[in-house]
Amino acid sequence: MNESPLAFIAHSALAPSGYDVQGRLNSHSAKAVPAPITLAFESSGNRSTRGALRRSFRQSGTKRVTDEQHRVPGPGDGDGLGIPPVAGVPWQAGLALAPPINRATMAPLPWTSNGASESAIGTSSANPGASEAARPVDQNYWQAAGQFRRLVLVGLVLTQTYLATSLMAAVLPYHGREPLEIAIVTLFAILFGWVSAGFWTAIAGFAIVLAGHDRYAISATAVPDAPVSPAVRTAVVMPICNEDVPRVFAGLRATYESLARTDLAMQFDMFVLSDTNNADSRVAEVEAWFETCRALDAFGRIFYRWRQHRIKRKSGNIADFCRRWGRNYRYLVILDADSVMSGECLSTLVRLMEANPGAGIIQTAPNATGRDTLHARAQQFASRVYGPLFTAGLHFWQLGESHYWGHNAIIRVEPFMRHCGLRRLTGRGLLSGEILSHDFVEAALMRRAGWSVWIAYDVPGSYEEMPPNLIDELKRDRRWCQGNLMNFRLSVMNGLQAAHRAVFVSGVMAYAAGLLWLAFLVLSTILLAVQILRDPQYFVAAYQMFPLWPEWHPEWALTLAGVTAGLLFLPKLLAAIAVAAHGAKPYGGGARLFASVLGESVVSMLLAPIRMLFHARFVVTTLCGWGVAWRSPPRNDAETTWSEAWRQHGTQTLIGLVWAAAVYSLNPGFLWWLLPVLGALIVAIPLSVLSSRVSLGRKLRDAGLFVIPEESHPPREIQTTMEESRRADGALPGFVEGVVDPAIVGLLCATGHVRPRPKPALRARRATLVRAALQRGPDDLSPADRMRLLCDPVALAQLHQNLWTAPHLRFAWTGVRASRTARPALRPAQ
């Protein structure tokens, strides 16, 4: 018998005679494997063979097959590929990775266009169920209130900054008249204004949280359980790239199961949009998708799309989805790889969109949860306690011109496709090219086109995860810094609302503040040296008639330091008061709540100087043209090793020691003013290591510190995510299994694309690739060759058949496979 490779896999991977009535392998059913080795693929019958393989998978559960059990069925095994159905995978489910393509366009507009001219857009979108007017139906009843509120904010910040800056100038020896003092006062004014804006945002949020509502809150417009037309369909998409596969599909499963408990479940589809370029992860993703669909009976509801050409990273991934299937949906919910959303939250977002036809984006306020390291637990606590104040405050000032953070948000598809395509930034260097931080830009473009962007700060059921340690947080900040600096170029774009220009500026200040703070401290130290090492100057200005005596008022300096500290700490205290007013028991009780606030303040105070130096370096290196690789962050509790801490923080420790020694030699008393900064830099290495420890985080949790409601009373979605992630951890196939394991090879081939009439050049490349894989084994294959094999079902099937028909060739592959961590057999759903 000399079959085509796909037929070989269809028979051997899915043969029924090797299984007992419970679907388990029968170890006594081994037969001989046919001997011929072929590198040719018979083009005739490809479609029918692949169709038979699909039908077999539709009716069967994938099963792990040992070397002896890999076999071709004999004449007595049944007629053709008649595989008895397996529970959980009905015939109708199929293996459709994605729905049929319904092509549309999503062309980026010129950055100078205001998006109002329909003729300049050239895109048309949706089906009748998704079709909407080109312009939003929005009376902008909130716009006058938003403008007035922002004027009040500007007035408060400017007044407060003026008073503090005047006091700062009075503190300096020459009252801000020397060039060095002018620079110090200027930096202080910018930094104090930045702190003041955050302070007044928290004050506004505190007022809203205590009052319980805001008259302009978007959440107040939805009617609970309001009927939604069946024509209104929503896609939930999760773009991923080389992510932790168990965590991704655990969160997806929790979201799907929660959604299934709502009345709008049948109006949602879910998509995993993969940009993965790692062969091991790619195999694991396909199998995890299949297992998830089989367990949930979700074939045709949960889809998987792998993108071969990774253009424009995440924004390009979403744009690719919109071009293929955007016309099928009115709304689009975007999740991150660590996101979880409740079905009630998703249903509420759809109803909010239906109630507000002028809304283009509604952003939720995700609660951070799921981590156990000390660093992450402090961040989770801060996000859960202080976050509601700041998000409510952002809503208060921005209203319908709010932030969009790129995930855990709902988007109106048609205007998004019309107006939010992202063009490359012209020029050279790191501040040109593809947009990296796309979310702020998309929100600005949506608002520029007339659609409102809201923060639904009080809609519960939205969750995310924090970086597990300081180093991983800073790696993420490095990427965001470059993206925000690029976005600053767009702050002068034609047609933008002032609120979104301010958003671009605030994105830059989030990282430039570190550089400005460092410059302020360095100039202050230089001023100290000048005052000590240089004779006093009594005439510091041209045509000065009377001498200016240098003065030092330590009591004024203490007052200024106290005011600044109050602006930083008071919002945290107010947040704790607001939480206690609504019940502190989910946070460990009132005493532990305030103790946790104090502890988090100490941790943040120690980490702030470390972040300052890193952020300053990020800004400088980005402006100098030093790029950074965008990699997926860890999705588990990764701890920092001592060697990694030395590499990352060694220079900071040296800077802290040298700086402290220099200040002490100049004026020992002045060292106390810089001790909170320099002391943190000196202990950066042990601080980074210890804050990453899971054991310390869990001890604090056991003591009732840094406790959040998602831990004391975990929602069902979080419980499901944790349970499924733990259950699947360590049980994933990789590239080797994707070539050797018949069940997984069958799955990959069944979900792959076969060209019906391959050209001779393709046949030759395929034969060369298979021959190289046979000769070199998996370890010597390049990452690109591995991905090419997985993308070509025919080549994969040829390689698989040759390995199983030639034991001496299979040794290089099975040896690797045997050394891997064993995982449970793939079993039919019970």
Task: Locate each region found by the language model.
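C-terminal amphipathic alpha-helical interaction region
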Residues: 634, 642-830
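N-terminal membrane-anchoring/stem segments of glycan-assembly enzymes
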Residues: 2-26, 30, 34-228, 503-539, ...
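Acidic, Ser/Thr-rich low-complexity segments on the non-lumenal side of membrane proteins
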Residues: 222-263, 606-617, 715-756
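Short helix-terminus and kink motifs of transmembrane alpha helices
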Residues: 197, 201, 205, 249, ...
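Composition- and surface-driven signal marking solvent-exposed, interaction-prone regions
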Residues: 181, 185, 250-252, 334, ...
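Short, glycine/acidic-rich beta->alpha junctions
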Residues: 184, 188-191, 251, 341, ...
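Basic/Trp-rich segment in TM-proximal cytosolic loops or flexible interdomain/linker regions
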Residues: 106-116, 120-122, 126-160, 173-182, ...
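Internal catalytic domains of large membrane-associated glycosyltransferases
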Residues: 103-104, 111, 115-116, 122, ...
